[in-house]
Amino acid sequence: MRRLEWKFMKRALILTKGRNYSMNASIEMMRNIGVVAHIDAGKTTLTERLLFLSGELRRMGDVDSGSTVTDFLEVERERGITVQSAIVSLPWKEHRINLIDTPGHVDFGVEVQRCVRVLDGLLVVLDGSAGVQAQTLTVWRQAAKYSLPSLFLVNKMDKPQADFAMSISSIEDKLGLRALPVVIPFSRETALEGFIDLVEGRCLKLSKGKNSEWMTIETKSCEFDVFSEGKENMCFGLSDSDQSFSSLFLDKYQGDTSKVSREDITQALRRVSLSRSACVVSSGSALRSASSVRPCLDLICNLLPSPVNSSKLVKESIGNHFSGLLFKIIHDKRRGRIGYTRVYSGELKGGSHLWNWTRGEKEGPIELFEAQSDSLDPIKSAKEGSIVAVRGLEKSLTGDAFIALDCDKRSFPEEDPASHIVFDG
């Protein structure tokens, strides 16, 4: 069997079919998130685990064997590193999450910069034995330019050298942020035992291997003391970062953590995440236990913003007409030149012509595809907030802005619509 035929057959065996579960999700239920990290922090393995947990994959691939969904180039599979960004979509509790897995090597920083421009939030992955590293700092500066809310995952906590406290300190010292741990590791002597979710009041024990599942922490369990101390630290940290929560927790509840509800904590965590007044930190070991990174999916949906605000900014200028930004161009072996585009307002329809506002040229007719890494599925239209693959933009370049042909050409914002977005709850 020819190599190309085997590639597509293998992909069909791995990816699940019938992905209409959340493709029609409202804009409020969308999340456009980038996964960023320094090289070898476990970013691609994390993405693979999230796809599996969501039901998008029948089985998980492995970076070392070259079988992951998002590292599909030959050089990526051979070297075990991400060279170019890959886009995947997955469902989680009525939400549609569009994830962009970005390169972690400093040599491909431009690729990351192009993607950050069209995102609404970031999931920053740290190696638990190294904390914040060079590429982490670079990406953080880019995120600050667009005021992107961010979550952190301290990964690889099963490594002998892993140090969660050191990783937290590196976030606060190098990025100048207050770190709020919400999923913490717990150990027996020096061995990692599992993880505790301080928001949900549950724990995951790694001793049960691949069958490990999150279980509610009982008051008589040996994990309860670790949970109680961790929740208290989290609540006092939140009080220092959010005035509303401070009034509730310190004044109304007199610092009693048992009176604070999950909803109280989640709403406060969302406020500090959107305002970037603090950063929420989870922990896990994506390679050893897929379940350990399950809280990341809940945190993405509960704490990070939808595309509503960025769409609202553009609509103030051009109403409900289509507008979009081309942020990545690839050459697909089967379909030729493909442009990845973020839809900021209106609806993008297959077969239509567009006006390249940046260059003053007409483009089209276009074909639309939903991208799942290197797999492109034809679709008829894409609504605002979507990230979509477009064929037919033959004269356009990365960074070009598009509007509908019937839109007033003078009304498009002079500045990049992502430049001055302020997120609210």
Q: Which functions belong to the PLM regions below?
A:
Residues 2-425:
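Structural and coupling elements of P-loop NTPases
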